[in-house]
Amino acid sequence: MSASASTAADFVRFALDEGVLRFGSFKVKSGRISPYFFNAGLFNSGRSVGTLAGFYAQALIDSGVAFDMLFGPAYKGIPLATATSVALAGHGAMAGRDVPFAFNRKEAKDHGEGGTLVGAPLTGKVVIIDDVITAGTSVRESVEIIRAAGAEPAAVLIALDRMERAGPDDALSPHSAVQDVARTYGIPVVSIASLADIMTLLQDDAQFAEHRAAVQAYRSKYGV
C-alpha cells in the first residue's frame, strides 16, 4: 500500500535532492549488486527530517488506516516516530488531534523508570514506523512488544518499498519482505513510495534515462 501518486513522486524527488536515493552500482545488505541505493540515514538535518516526517504523516493519512499512536523501534525508528508525531499534530486533516508515540531501548534500564519502553504507554491501535523492511526482524520484535503491552499492531509505515523478493539467488522467495510481513502479521504495510515510483521517474525524466535499463533489469530479476 503506497501513498498517493503525487506524494510518492514528490518523495522520490526529495530523496534524490537529499542524496538519499542514488543511482549507480551498490552492494546492498542482501549481497546483491543493486543499480540504486536508498539510505534514509542521510536525512540527518532538522529541515530534511521535518520534510520527511511530513511525507510519513501524509502517507499514513492517505492510507486510511485507523490508529491511536506511533511506535519507533530502536534505533532508526526513534527519530522517525518522534518527528512524524510532530508532523501529524500540525496536519490539517488531524483536526488538532495529538498523536502519542513510544519507542524501545535495546537494553533495559536498571534505574529511574527502568524497563525498555520510553514515551507514551502502548495502548490501542499502534503504527510501527521504520525506514525500510529488509528481513522483517525489527517488525517482529515491535509486534511482540506491542502485543505484550496489550495493544494492537495496526500497520507498518515505511519510507520505501523496494518490491524485492527475499532470499538468496538460488532460492528466491515468491514474496518480498514487505509482503511477508503483511501476510505473517495480518497488517498492512504502508510506504511513502516504492520501486514502481522510482521506475516512473526514470521513464518520465530524460536526465535519469541512462539508469532506466539497469533498474528495469534488476526489477525483472528480483522484483515482485
From Swiss-Prot:
Pathway recorded for this protein: Pyrimidine metabolism; UMP biosynthesis via de novo pathway; UMP from orotate: step 1/2
Organism encoding this protein: Bordetella pertussis (strain Tohama I / ATCC BAA-589 / NCTC 13251)
Keywords, sorted A to Z: Glycosyltransferase, Magnesium, Pyrimidine biosynthesis, Transferase
Cofactor: Mg(2+)
Catalytic reaction equation(s): orotidine 5'-phosphate + diphosphate = orotate + 5-phospho-alpha-D-ribose 1-diphosphate
InterPro entries linked to this entry: OPRT, Or_phspho_trans_dom, PRibTrfase_dom, PRTase-like
Cited function: Catalyzes the transfer of a ribosyl phosphate group from 5-phosphoribose 1-diphosphate to orotate, leading to the formation of orotidine monophosphate (OMP).
EC annotation from Swiss-Prot or TrEMBL: 2.4.2.10
A molecular-function term among this protein's GO annotations: orotate phosphoribosyltransferase activity
Name of the molecule in the record: Orotate phosphoribosyltransferase
